[in-house]
Amino acid sequence: PDEHLSVSRTSLFTRTDTRVRYRGSLADLKGYTIGVVAGFSYGTLFDNADYLKKEEVQNTRRLISMVVSGRLPLGIENEAVIRGVAGSLGVAGSIRFLNPPVHSRKLYAGFSRRLELRKLAEEFSRSLKDFKNSGEYRDILRKYDVSHSELTRQREKTSGS
């Protein structure tokens, strides 16, 4: 389909009271230790940044707790995952995300390339686009603390990719 489901953003996060100078260049982060979940990829640019000090942790819950406790100044992970896990841990108000994201990409539903499914994919894309313009969609985003303007900005930024 032409219409993407959402945008996946891999972002840096820190405590709300921690000052970090980051303007979108990974070189800005040379003096910091960045928590990463072992075995995960955070985009080629970050993964290949050997000049950064990265500390592996077992899982996302541990990553968040180490950042919130001050044991790590920064963490990196999928933004939606961090929001969800931090919310379940009751610490969502203790962290903030740094902009811009380190990596982002559109997520699509996959359909077989068989000719008879092409029409279904086109209908799905049209219906998804209509749904994204609905109040129901905005209500869902609000429920899960995702701003519509944030998604619109991401859609505009990634429309060329």
Regions found by a protein language model. Name each.
Residues 6-11, 87-125, 147-160:
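Periplasmic-binding protein-like
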Residues 17-20, 32-33, 110-147:
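Extended ligand-binding regions for polar small-molecule ligands
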Residues 1-29, 39-40, 99-102:
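Acidic, polar ligand-binding/catalytic clefts
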Residues 10, 26, 43, 61-64, ...:
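Extracytoplasmic/secreted envelope proteins and their assembly/folding machinery
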Residues 36, 52-66, 99:
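Short beta-strand-to-loop elements that line the ligand-binding cleft
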Residues 28, 48, 61-81, 88-89:
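Short helices/loops that flank or line small-molecule/ion binding pockets
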Residues 41-54, 94, 128-161:
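Ligand-binding clefts/hinges and TM-proximal coupling segments of bilobed small-molecule sensing domains
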Residues 13, 35-36, 75, 110:
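Short, well-ordered beta-strand segments
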